[in-house]
């Protein structure tokens, strides 16, 4: 047994809460740790979606009560230090009780008290930031963490503890075939260009409203697969009325199999959440990003630039998103050879082994 093997942490506590963007990468890492025989537990908030996402995952959940402490009125600001202290003490209790040997924070407010608790107990902390602009909690925790993982380069100031790992993504997406081959096969088969529109689980209204009109004006044969979110299917389909016959449209509230949707698409129009951008790079698909304008610190634009700067994607800010402006971006892209080149550039930016990289860094703590 080498020295390194002896030292590997036997019990790792994951800290991720609030949104799928934090929880899914943490879950990918947790599953990989479990496969390697490491015991895993999860620090969560009582009402967070992580509780639902972790159902049937065979990971014990420990809850601490902490609400967001950024903004939200004077009283909450005054109460915040007491809430944080109470939550930190709860987290310390769990960590002692479980004999936690390493703590991995993936964002969400739960990671703040969790990181402080680990620090107070002398347990090493590693954090992972999914976005190109670090969130509030991770910015604070980066100072006390032993290792800092960033999905995109330049999120944190460079120093020896910062590692660019990429974002952990689902296995089905890392297994998608090479883009050059996929695009070439579609070209050989004489298939019309296939455009995928992803509005996210809620459906991005800006995309549902403006994209159909732009596509109707393009006047080229297209197969369009438009995911519009729950309750928006009828109205979105109605916006395609009066379309030319060569525009084939399939409107769906949800896409069950994202890996299949990516692999069949020549071009995707979507938001620029961290995981979406990472999945598009991993799959290798040309993209037009419409960043969510309300995202904290405009982090979606920063995420989108990661692919746009290398020529793999275009950015259309929501403020200037009209059917006309979108048509102007789309028209020159109606060429599969060009889209194939963009897809190849996207794939060059991918880090498909992100999960393994983060797991290795946890084991080296």
PLM-predicted stretches and their roles:
Residues 9-17, 35-82, 228-232, 317-319:
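Conserved nucleotide-sugar phosphate-binding/catalytic loop shared by glycosyltransferases and other
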Residues 22-33:
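Short amphipathic alpha-helix
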Residues 39, 49, 60, 119-180:
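Active-site-proximal region of nucleotide-activated glycan assembly enzymes
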Residues 48, 53, 57, 174, ...:
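Donor-nucleotide binding loops and adjacent catalytic segments primarily
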Residues 73-102:
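An amphipathic, basic-hydrophobic alpha-helix
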Residues 100-102, 263-278, 285:
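Acidic donor-binding loop of glycosyltransferase active sites
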Residues 338-352:
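A short, well-ordered alpha-helix in the C-terminal region of glycosyltransferases
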Residues 352-365:
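C-terminal alpha-helical cap of glycosyltransferases
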